[in-house]
Curated annotation (Swiss-Prot):
Catalyzes the attachment of proline to tRNA(Pro) in a two-step reaction: proline is first activated by ATP to form Pro-AMP and then transferred to the acceptor end of tRNA(Pro). As ProRS can inadvertently accommodate and process non-cognate amino acids such as alanine and cysteine, to avoid such errors it has two additional distinct editing activities against alanine. One activity is designated as 'pretransfer' editing and involves the tRNA(Pro)-independent hydrolysis of activated Ala-AMP. One of its GO terms (molecular function) is proline-tRNA ligase activity. HAMAP family: Pro_tRNA_synth_type1 (MF_01569). It comes from Ralstonia nicotianae (strain ATCC BAA-1114 / GMI1000) (Ralstonia solanacearum). This is Proline--tRNA ligase. GO terms for cellular component: cytosol. The keyword Protein biosynthesis applies. It catalyses: tRNA(Pro) + L-proline + ATP = L-prolyl-tRNA(Pro) + AMP + diphosphate. It is found in: Cytoplasm. InterPro entries: aa-tRNA-synt_IIb, aa-tRNA-synth_II, aa-tRNA-synth_II/BPL/LPL, Anticodon-bd, Anticodon-bd_dom_sf, Pro-tRNA-ligase_IIa, Pro-tRNA-synth_IIa_bac-type, Pro-tRNA-Synthase_IIa_type1. It holds the Pfam family HGTP_anticodon. Its EC number is 6.1.1.15. The gene is proS. NCBIfam families: PRK09194.1 (NF006625), proS_fam_II (TIGR00409). Keywords: Aminoacyl-tRNA synthetase, ATP-binding, Cytoplasm, Ligase, Nucleotide-binding, Protein biosynthesis.
């Protein structure tokens, strides 16, 4: 391809509303153009990257035995009403009416539609396993679209849905998809981690997220450097302390702590470690036809509540944080001085595993400007129910018993779920087993954010000059930059010869024949991020050399024209 037959439109400065690196560089490189809030046109450079991402995904999905379909973007509301998600999805799901006043959905995902396909097409256990996948547009009406394509409203996603006869079959399908995803991200050339995850709103049992590692990632990834253990922060288990609880050595004392509403301030006044303080978090669980049930969760002063874990405490599903009025009624004091001793109303007390192992600790006294010191379980307050309630921190023991935990940042780009029978039961997607009995299908779902991959890849691979694409998903593998293409017959002839030679060898190459000055030409392609550049100039030709430089190379190498193809093949294969 020649640049004169392509479309290149770069910017020296990013638009003012571009917040993160990938958004800025995609706008500057002319990959995307903003149309509205969270809505982008993919320009030729960006679309070429998308097509390469799609190709890798499609090849690995097909190799895994999945079958491609294409489901409509607009879907009837009746299917979503069957599963209850018409009401549960909230405002992120775009609802519209057609001219006949029929309710429709602009799909955010396709569990309902694919389950409808399965219940009408699959009758017998002999037709399973089957895995349908699509690469299709999705729409989620984000409250605050931001970060370019990383949190846009319209995006492209690969979503797959497996159907099996039993849990064992689902496990096999899940492992196939896990393996396919691993190969996909390896082929992308990105540093990534697959981590154990919570299933969230989609539901089901097993779940893993695939994260591209990047310092700017929104998600905290927990892993052990000494093993394969990895999980997102929501799912990582915080083990109970290995040491048993120490004996009480202090008397219970009510201590004046004026204007010390935070654990840090209390610890500073008392001259103790923050780890000896306990924070109180008040939750409420609404009861139909009655007063809300108030819960008091106790965490060590330096730890943070994990809301996902809290929601899994028996009786705390769908909790909310208590209002100030509810707190005053239950404890008689505003937040900052709350504790489990001497509450005004009965509350349900739950302690984190770490707190349950503490002795001689500090809690609020349920009186403004006062805390209790020397608090001990069994003596000063009854033993509480104990659960894992907190986020892990660096240095915690790994749940697999191998080493201690480290934390990095990641961008979620893929997710695999074991759905089980959640959708098949609600939509009556059943089959006849070998005994002629009706059984619900076991489902799995598997998503990859196709367009999100672009942003994540850039967040991981860039420098001051622009994007640095991995070879497999770069818009072009090689750019030929002739200096004086429109002035020198020798330069033009060699550039055209090399372009034809590389293209014939199957290399994705573009020849910049726009006649730009060398500095501007080089800057454009460094910004766009093409992995390799070959410079053809009169001076080099006189010496029998061309300049070849990788995007990450500090300097160009002089290569004989006859050796460029072999050199590039070797570099591209690395």
């Amino acid at each position: 391809m020649k640049a004169s037959q392509f479309f290149i439109s770069t910017l020296k400065e990013a638009p003012a509303d571009a917040e993160i690196v990938s958004h800025k560089l995609m706008m500057r490189a002319g990959m995307i153009k903003k149309l509205g809030a969270g809505l982008y046109t993919y320009m030729p450079v960006g679309l070429r990257v998308i097509r390469k991402v799609e190709q890798i995904v499609r090849e690995e999905m097909n190799a895994s035995g999945a079958v491609e379909v294409l489901m409509p973007v607009v879907q009837p509301a009746e299917l979503w009403q069957e599963t209850g998600r018409w009401d549960k999805m909230g405002d992120e799901m775009m609802r519209v009416k057609d001219r006949h006043e029929r309710d429709l959905v602009i799909q955010p995902t396709s569990e309902e539609v694919v389950t409808d396909i399965a219940r009408t097409e699959i009758r017998s256990y002999k037709q399973m396993p089957v895995n349908f996948y699509q690469i299709q547009t999705k729409f989620r009406d984000e409250r605050r679209p931001r970060f370019g394509i990383m949190r846009g409203r319209e995006f492209t996603m690969k979503d797959a849905y497996s159907f099996d006869r039993d849990a064992e079959g689902l496990k096999v399908s899940y492992e196939k998809m896990y393996g396919a995803y691993t190969r996909i991200f390896q082929r992308f050339g990105l540093e990534f981690r697959a981590v154990a995850a919570d299933n969230g709103a989609i539901g089901g049992s097993g779940s893993h997220e695939f994260h591209v590692i990047a310092d700017t990632g929104e998600d905290a990834i927990v892993y052990s450097p000494d093993s394969d253990y990895a999980a997102n922060i929501e799912a990582a288990e915080a083990l109970a302390p290995a040491m048993p609880r120490g004996a009480a050595t202090e008397a219970l004392t009510k201590t004046h702590t004026p204007k010390r509403a935070k654990c840090e301030a209390v610890a500073e006044q008392l001259g103790i470690a923050l780890q000896r303080t306990v924070k109180s978090i008040v939750l409420a669980k609404d009861v139909e036809g009655g007063e809300p049930q108030i819960w008091l969760l106790l965490l060590r002063g330096d730890h943070e509540l994990n809301e996902i874990k809290a929601s899994k405490v028996p009786g705390l599903a769908d909790f909310r944080f208590a209002t100030e009025g509810e707190i005053l009624r239950a404890f008689g004091t505003p937040p900052g001085y709350l504790g489990p001793i001497g509450t005004k109303q009965p509350v349900k007390v739950v302690a984190d595993r770490t707190v349950a192992a503490m002795s001689d600790f500090v809690v609020g006294a349920n009186e403004e400007d006062f805390h209790y010191t020397g608090v001990n379980w069994g003596r000063d307050l009854p033993e509480a129910e104990v659960y894992d309630l907190r986020n892990v921190v660096e240095g915690d023991p790994s749940p697999d018993g191998k080493g201690t935990l480290a934390i990095c940042r990641g961008i979620e780009v893929g997710h695999v779920f074991m759905l089980g029978t959640r959708y098949s039961e609600s939509m009556s997607a059943t089959f006849l087993d070998e005994n002629g009995k009706t059984q619900p299908m076991m489902m799995g779902c598997y998503g990859i954010g196709i367009t999100r991959i672009l942003g994540a890849a850039i967040e991981q691979n860039y420098d001051a000059r622009g994007i640095i694409w991995p070879v497999s998903i770069a818009p072009f593998e090689v750019v030929i930059c002739p200096v004086g293409y429109d002035r020198s017959e020798a330069v033009r002839a060699e550039a055209d010869r090399l372009h034809a030679e590389l293209a014939a060898a199957g290399i994705d190459v573009i020849l910049d024949d726009r006649g730009e000055r060398p500095g501007a030409m080089f800057a454009d392609w460094e910004l766009i991020g093409v992995p390799f550049r070959v410079v053809v100039g009169e001076r080099g030709l006189k010496d029998g050399k061309l300049e070849l430089q990788g995007r990450r190379d500090e300097a160009a190498a002089a290569v004989a024209p006859a050796d460029v193809l072999a050199t590039l093949k070797s570099r591209l294969a690395q």
